[in-house]
């Protein structure tokens, strides 16, 4: 533990706790301090001026990262017939209907994204208590209930990320790996921030985007000046 504490303290050196860094400078600091023996994920977190306990202040959506996320996404699709064939052709890892329902009910959830055609939702609805708490329940608002299963699978595999504000008003996502070029991470973060900005709910009052920070899996957080992230 002492060794870990020393590593964390060393990583924080050179980062001013109260300073708001320009996005490109923040990314440079994050990349320099990512010293783990694996390719750490770069994550962005945004504190929003919303109270998600109120329905008119809920923030959720999906963002297609222009440079991908760098992670392997396992996709399950509930579909039948031609749509099931489309899902398999697009690279879905698991495709099924009642058979897939039984697998999930049995506790075997080996996927990161779940997609369903609209006609399958009465079936998928039975899995609400299983998929809901894991953030895996298909939802038309984020494009995971759709007839375009081929496009949805391709998007999930290609780097689309779903986001949903948490109780404290925070939304976050992995936006790449530390091995990515800095400019690609900047592009991904700006795309994500823009998607969150466009998802601003009608009930939001005051300053919507209040704070932004970036970090890596094992690294310290770096506060970012919002004006260097938001493009609009």
From Swiss-Prot:
Report the GO terms under cellular component. Answer: cytosolic large ribosomal subunit
Presence of keyword Repressor: yes
Q: Which InterPro entries match?
A: Ribosom_uL1_bac-type (IPR005878), Ribosomal_uL1 (IPR002143), Ribosomal_uL1-like (IPR023674), Ribosomal_uL1/biogenesis (IPR028364), Ribosomal_uL1_3-a/b-sand (IPR016095), Ribosomal_uL1_CS (IPR023673)
Q: Decide whether keyword Transmembrane helix is in the record.
A: no
Alphabetical UniProt keywords:
Repressor, Ribonucleoprotein, Ribosomal protein, RNA-binding, rRNA-binding, Translation regulation, tRNA-binding
GO MF terms listed in the record are: rRNA binding; structural constituent of ribosome; tRNA binding
Q: Where is the signal peptide?
A: none
Against CDD domains, the record matches this protein to: Ribosomal_L1
Entry superkingdom: Bacteria
What family does the database annotate?
Belongs to the universal ribosomal protein uL1 family.
Q: How does it assemble?
A: Part of the 50S ribosomal subunit.
Query: This protein is called what?
Result: Large ribosomal subunit protein uL1
């Amino acid at each position: 533990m002492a060794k870990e504490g020393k590593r964390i303290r060393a990583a924080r050196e050179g980062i001013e706790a109260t300073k708001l860094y320009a996005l490109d400078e923040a990314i440079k600091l994050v990349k320099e301090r990512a010293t783990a023996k694996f390719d750490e994920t770069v994550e962005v977190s945004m504190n929003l001026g919303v109270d998600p306990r109120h329905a008119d202040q809920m923030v959720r959506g999906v963002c297609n990262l222009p440079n991908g996320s760098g992670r392997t996404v396992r996709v399950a699709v509930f579909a039948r017939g031609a749509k099931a064939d489309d899902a398999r052709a697009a690279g879905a890892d698991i495709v099924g209907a009642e058979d897939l329902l039984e697998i999930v009910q049995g506790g075997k959830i080996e996927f990161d994204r779940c997609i369903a055609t609209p006609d399958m939702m009465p079936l998928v609805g039975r899995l609400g208590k299983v998929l809901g708490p894991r953030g895996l329940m298909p939802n038309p608002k984020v494009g995971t209930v759709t007839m375009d299963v081929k496009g949805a699978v391709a998007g999930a595999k290609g780097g689309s990320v779903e986001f949903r504000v948490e109780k404290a008003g925070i939304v976050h996502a992995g936006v790449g790996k530390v091995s990515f070029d800095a400019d690609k991470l900047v592009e991904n973060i700006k795309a994500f921030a823009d998607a969150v900005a466009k998802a601003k709910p009608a009930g939001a009052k005051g300053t919507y985007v209040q704070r932004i920070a970036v970090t890596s899996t094992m690294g310290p957080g770096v506060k970012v000046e919002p004006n260097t992230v938001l493009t609009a």
